[in-house]
Amino acid sequence: RCCPMPGCFAGPFCPCC
């Protein structure tokens, strides 16, 4: 899961995972 932040999406491009 990724943190609930704008621009953060589940996937290889999620910087807050």
Curated annotation (Swiss-Prot):
Keywords: Disulfide bond, Secreted, Toxin. Expressed by the venom duct. It is found in: Secreted. GO terms for molecular function: toxin activity. GO terms for cellular component: extracellular region. It comes from the Eukaryota. Disulfide bonds join 2-16, 3-14, 8-17. Its main location: secreted. Belongs to the conotoxin M superfamily. The cysteine framework is III (CC-C-C-CC). This is Conotoxin Reg12h. It comes from Conus regius. The lineage of its organism: Eukaryota, Metazoa, Spiralia, Lophotrochozoa, Mollusca.
